Regions:
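Acidic carboxylate-rich catalytic motifs and surrounding loops in phosphoryl-/glycosyl-chemistry enzymes
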Residues: 26-31, 213-219
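Residue-level preference for alpha-helix termini and adjacent loops
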Residues: 94, 211-212
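Short acidic-glycine loop/turn motifs at beta-strand connectors
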Residues: 154-158, 220-223
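General beta-strand recognition
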Residues: 160-161, 226
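C-terminal active-site "lid" helix and adjoining low-complexity regulatory extension at the edge
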Residues: 189-196, 200, 207-210, 219-247
């Protein structure tokens, strides 16, 4: 995986520069706060005793995150530069109050370390985002609101294709709502005007980003669209059968 390009700290500033709508976001590079933090987090995960420097790093880390949370406000959306692990919603990215912040940080850090057994996902970049107001069609994965999202693929200045973000198989045995399939089918359709809006933003982004990329568009409760995530195309899930699956 291309961790450097996929990191939110790489693509978000470019979107902001373009004037593309994105959630209010605060980003912190913990390597600049205390270079001992990331090694200390990995040490704790592997059940090793923290030393004095490790404890100092953790204290700084907590202080920075709590300050970020205070500025954004609760509830907030938590992620690293690489992932939010949103399928564990209540235990990772959704932070209802400051009392739950460090618990969710720990869960997200553990997931990141285990995600790649060679080295783990990078965990130096930590992000808090304003929780967008939504009107979910249904909930899944223990309370995660499922709303309208679409993924675009771009390459060298052009739009290759567009797909609904959520395939139906993603919700197998994960939803209590008996009518979720019909709701999903309805929300996975774009009107012609909506496609024009998203195409316009995607083309603007495609002109800025070189190579093969995915763009995730998200609609809030007031029917406004924004970009919530990007990644290199080869590191992004692509609907089966699409001829642009490999760019």
């Amino acid at each position: 995986m291309n961790y450097k390009q996929n990191c939110l700290s790489n693509w978000l500033p470019k979107l902001v520069e373009l004037g593309i709508p994105t959630p209010s976001t605060i980003v912190a590079d913990m390597n600049k706060v205390d270079k001992n933090l990331v090694p200390a987090m990995r040490k704790i995960f592997w059940m090793k005793e923290p030393n004095k420097e490790d404890k100092i790093a953790f204290t700084k880390f907590r202080s920075v995150l709590e300050s970020m949370g205070h500025k954004i406000g609760y509830p907030l959306f938590l992620r690293t530069g690489q992932t939010s692990h949103k399928h564990e919603w209540q235990n990772t990215c959704f932070v209802e109050s400051q009392n739950l912040l460090m618990k969710n940080v720990q869960n997200l850090a553990e997931h990141s370390i285990m995600a790649d057994y060679k080295s783990g996902f990078p965990i130096n970049i930590w992000v808090v985002r304003k929780m967008l107001e939504v009107k979910p069609a249904f909930t899944a994965f223990g309370g995660m609101p499922i709303v309208r999202e679409f993924r675009y693929f771009i390459k060298n200045g052009k739009i290759l294709c567009r797909h609904p973000y959520w395939p139906d198989w993603a919700f197998k045995n994960m939803v209590k709502d008996k009518n979720w399939k019909s709701k999903l089918e309805k929300m996975n359709k774009l009107s012609s005007n909506e496609q024009i809006t998203l195409d316009s933003m995607a083309k603007k982004i495609a002109e800025k980003f070189k190579g093969f990329w995915s763009i995730d568009f998200f609609q809030d409760s007031k029917f406004r669209w924004c970009v919530i995530d990007m990644a290199t195309g080869k590191d992004s899930y692509h609907w089966k059968g699409c001829k642009y699956g490999k760019g």
